[in-house]
């Protein structure tokens, strides 16, 4: 690397003779030396120039500067008649060390100048700056054949400070140095002096120090100064973090990462780091420190908050003045103390003013209707400075004679509620008739429970009127016969007077329009003339002087059959029927034993009956596995499916006549002694799910998941349980859960699979909300799609694809599991499995599968789109709280789930493609895998997010944006989602109604100061949930 520096300029007369004597800075600087030296004005000019060059940049640390060495340099020149030192002093008598050589008339010059040992002070890369003058060979008469215009520079690394015995060939050449400008006799005549500056770097260095050497090969040169230095990034304070002096790296392109330390009274927000470049510059700052609570940033330091000011959190930039009704007399306050009779809840932000309980409600009025009372009032004059005012109703029953009151008790009902009332009205029902009551209406707010003062309430005294009795609640059956039912009951809890009679209404079930009324003064009746073996519905109500009460709830009782015996009849008819049935069954068995025709029909499904009815006839069937032809056995095992070499085809285990045969063909039997159950991790449809270890002979121990079949299972449950193993055993793919084997020869019956440490995908995502990059989420989706492609290629339909049925291991590998609802798809692309009833997971199921119960690989693609939505939303419930019927209706009308927050546009478009109504328009799983692979290979395509405003604008407009007023105020909504701290901010920025809140976007939240990602997501998700009540949240296709 060649550098150029400042060029000193001076004027002097040419020397009188000696053409081989150069004009040297040393001779020019000899202000007080021999008369043969340069004039005084020239040396003063050069000395001044040299002094201006002494200051080095702040990022350069000198290891040697010949201009500043006060004593002898200690350099060695050889041969002795080569380099010579010209020792001069400036006007301050400071030495100036200069070396010159000018052997241009002699051939084969080899003059060396060696420096003393130079310590590198830990630097691995150093720089050498040379300042020199050089005579133009053309200006030297007679020296053209021997004169040179370059010289060489070398170095030698050494830990020895006294090692001067270094051979020439041990030195390593740094470079050949040439002058940018050389001087001639014309320059001498014009009084111009030309000074060259060259810089070279050396590295990496591995020892403690080094020597420099300069070789002259026949030039006329003067070495004015030598400066050796290394570069550093100087100590600096950035973002309240101190970064120390840092020596640059050995590589010219290397960036050294340096960690900073926070200044006093500050804490780490994100660990502060910067990168030191090879040129000694600080680059790429990362992270920062923040002044801790009670301190604020000023001039790069953290200054204490003054009395009367506070700062509650490091995330707040400046100290703020204490809010109303609070104060602080201390420095470094993190909160302010409330004034007397003012309070602050723990959930109130420190920036909120201190508040007090409200005054009493005003102008309470009552309206009595028999045994119910309606109260109404107006809000208190003083709300205490809070917006969370609610009301509590205290009820007291008073004795008009003694003037004593007691609590009403639990029988009184309050509509809508007793406490937490937001409206200024309430109704009390189920009061006692002819009773004096006192109702106290108390206004409370968020700090009422913190105040030791007296309750603030208004009282209302009322007397109830005469009322009808309450409903009959406890009805018991008595004697039941084929034509009659006897019942008894207890008096109503609140008769509200003397019971005059009871009215009993009954009718045959599902024939309510034809009923019978019986009246009784007792609490028992017998209804007669009923039909045998029929269900009857009874309702009872009481009557007082005030009239009838309401009917009781419905009670159902069934009469006995015609042949059934009542409590006082004999058991003869029952015995007779039992004997008759037994005779019929015996006749059937004898008929089967006498008839061998079932075995003459070949080896169909009747063969199993043949073996049970007549074991001696098994040989006639020709179906015993021991005697079976291998080809016949093969055809039987595959039940008509032809297996081509190299082609894997799924075989439905339900087509096997003997389900156990399917299990043994596709699943490996494991000895129970090889399995160690460690703990229960869940419960399945058939029993417990455990984790444990599997140690097979000659193989390493494996962690496994173990499904067990519960005790007391039926044969059908056993078949269904092992059926899943028969399905899993046919699959071999890294994204399909792997079956290790089954245990069927001992109890409990077990299915053993690989163990997935992180469990189900939906639960895992909820636990790790927002913790993964988009690429990681796409990687999960890619694994799921690869597994589904494998199943689809085998002609297999899953039917229940959802995040809950995807398992994920510690390496974030997703695997498809849970084949309980799965069925086979034939080779015909139009074939589909028709279910035989049963539950369908509506939120994940394609519309054609819901409507016609037809399942195809295309319906699995629809379900995969829902899984994509679950993954990107970190396990949110699809369609939130919409009912299944609302989901079916919305999807049928063409609406789709909105994009999750911060969802890449490419992923949401793929979701919408999976949700095409026409199943043939949906992508195939192999196309989905290819699309996701492209996204992974090109991460920049995932940076474009679905526009938040578009997500809102695409929602249905004909419905209320907030679900028909689910919340009456912004404060109530924020409190409900535990975000009440932002109430004041919303109100101050004009979001005072729920309709205004409906238009809030993510950018609006950031502008309002909601900076925590978790809080942003909670608020946006709540808004989105409200928007999708009924079908508000669906995006039309």
UniProtKB/Swiss-Prot annotation:
<protein>
    <recommendedName>
        <fullName>Ephrin type-A receptor 5</fullName>
        <ecNumber>2.7.10.1</ecNumber>
    </recommendedName>
</protein>
<dbReference type="GO" id="GO:0005886">
    <property type="term" value="C:plasma membrane"/>
</dbReference>
<keyword id="KW-0418">Kinase</keyword>
<feature type="glycosylation site" description="N-linked (GlcNAc...) asparagine">
    <location>
        <position position="369"/>
    </location>
</feature>
<feature type="domain" description="Eph LBD">
    <location>
        <begin position="60"/>
        <end position="238"/>
    </location>
</feature>
<dbReference type="GO" id="GO:0005005">
    <property type="term" value="F:transmembrane-ephrin receptor activity"/>
</dbReference>
<keyword id="KW-0808">Transferase</keyword>
<dbReference type="GO" id="GO:0030424">
    <property type="term" value="C:axon"/>
</dbReference>
<keyword id="KW-0597">Phosphoprotein</keyword>
<dbReference type="InterPro" id="IPR036116">
    <property type="entry name" value="FN3_sf"/>
</dbReference>
<keyword id="KW-1003">Cell membrane</keyword>
<dbReference type="InterPro" id="IPR001245">
    <property type="entry name" value="Ser-Thr/Tyr_kinase_cat_dom"/>
</dbReference>
<comment type="similarity">
    <text>Belongs to the protein kinase superfamily. Tyr protein kinase family. Ephrin receptor subfamily.</text>
</comment>
<dbReference type="InterPro" id="IPR013761">
    <property type="entry name" value="SAM/pointed_sf"/>
</dbReference>
<dbReference type="InterPro" id="IPR008266">
    <property type="entry name" value="Tyr_kinase_AS"/>
</dbReference>
<feature type="domain" description="Fibronectin type-III 2">
    <location>
        <begin position="468"/>
        <end position="562"/>
    </location>
</feature>
<dbReference type="GO" id="GO:0061178">
    <property type="term" value="P:regulation of insulin secretion involved in cellular response to glucose stimulus"/>
</dbReference>
<keyword id="KW-0966">Cell projection</keyword>
<keyword id="KW-0067">ATP-binding</keyword>
<dbReference type="InterPro" id="IPR001090">
    <property type="entry name" value="Ephrin_rcpt_lig-bd_dom"/>
</dbReference>
<dbReference type="InterPro" id="IPR003961">
    <property type="entry name" value="FN3_dom"/>
</dbReference>
<dbReference type="Pfam" id="PF00536">
    <property type="entry name" value="SAM_1"/>
</dbReference>
<feature type="domain" description="Protein kinase">
    <location>
        <begin position="675"/>
        <end position="936"/>
    </location>
</feature>
<feature type="transmembrane region" description="Helical">
    <location>
        <begin position="574"/>
        <end position="594"/>
    </location>
</feature>
<keyword id="KW-0325">Glycoprotein</keyword>
<dbReference type="InterPro" id="IPR027936">
    <property type="entry name" value="Eph_TM"/>
</dbReference>
<keyword id="KW-0677">Repeat</keyword>
<dbReference type="Pfam" id="PF14575">
    <property type="entry name" value="EphA2_TM"/>
</dbReference>
<dbReference type="InterPro" id="IPR001426">
    <property type="entry name" value="Tyr_kinase_rcpt_V_CS"/>
</dbReference>
<feature type="glycosylation site" description="N-linked (GlcNAc...) asparagine">
    <location>
        <position position="461"/>
    </location>
</feature>
<keyword id="KW-0472">Membrane</keyword>
<dbReference type="InterPro" id="IPR017441">
    <property type="entry name" value="Protein_kinase_ATP_BS"/>
</dbReference>
<dbReference type="GO" id="GO:0005524">
    <property type="term" value="F:ATP binding"/>
</dbReference>
<comment type="function">
    <text>Receptor tyrosine kinase which binds promiscuously GPI-anchored ephrin-A family ligands residing on adjacent cells, leading to contact-dependent bidirectional signaling into neighboring cells. The signaling pathway downstream of the receptor is referred to as forward signaling while the signaling pathway downstream of the ephrin ligand is referred to as reverse signaling. Among GPI-anchored ephrin-A ligands, EFNA5 most probably constitutes the cognate/functional ligand for EPHA5.</text>
</comment>
<dbReference type="GO" id="GO:0032956">
    <property type="term" value="P:regulation of actin cytoskeleton organization"/>
</dbReference>
<dbReference type="InterPro" id="IPR050449">
    <property type="entry name" value="Ephrin_rcpt_TKs"/>
</dbReference>
<dbReference type="GO" id="GO:0005003">
    <property type="term" value="F:ephrin receptor activity"/>
</dbReference>
<keyword id="KW-0675">Receptor</keyword>
<feature type="modified residue" description="Phosphotyrosine; by autocatalysis">
    <location>
        <position position="982"/>
    </location>
</feature>
<dbReference type="GO" id="GO:0048471">
    <property type="term" value="C:perinuclear region of cytoplasm"/>
</dbReference>
<dbReference type="InterPro" id="IPR016257">
    <property type="entry name" value="Tyr_kinase_ephrin_rcpt"/>
</dbReference>
<dbReference type="Pfam" id="PF07714">
    <property type="entry name" value="PK_Tyr_Ser-Thr"/>
</dbReference>
